[in-house]
Amino acid sequence: LDTIKKRLGDLEELLEELFLYTRLQGGALPLECGKTAALPPLWEALAEFYPQLEAAGAAPELRFDRENLAVWASPEALGRVYRNLIANALRHGGGGLTVSGRDGEICFSNELLPGPRPDLEHLFDRFYQSSPARARGGAGLGLSIVRELMERMGGQVSAGIAENELWIKLVFAQ
């Protein structure tokens, strides 16, 4: 029964991501951007994933230069970006999640699992999954949705690897 519940949850997540991605590609999802408090949507996303974070022993570390950090974004899209990045860290990371922020930038970083490194050139491509990631589920849409939402809000997203950590940086329009 637990296996069936998990598979149904995975299928629901896949359908939700496909629907969102299709709406984004078709221009059917208007985003109303403005000066948005960066932390409240992050707290909501972290609370949503609290059981998974706790089970993974991945208590997030937050490093923001101030609590009232604001970015140019749609609050709903920003929340979705956060949720996708947290889900990605849980699914593909080796523990430890750090989120840092300063004027116009927010960076998520997490430890990598042992094995082959993700291909940074294709990390944000639709349906991209590194070889080991295929065994951990997902459709390969989460990070492409992050890129699409960031670009629709006038921002950018980039990724890199430093030592044994993957970092994903969100740069918001000023």
Locations of regions flagged by a protein language model:
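Short beta-strand/loop element within the Bergerat-fold HATPase_c
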Residues: 96-105
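Short helix-loop "hinge" at the ATP-lid/N-box region of the Bergerat-fold HATPase_c
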Residues: 89-90
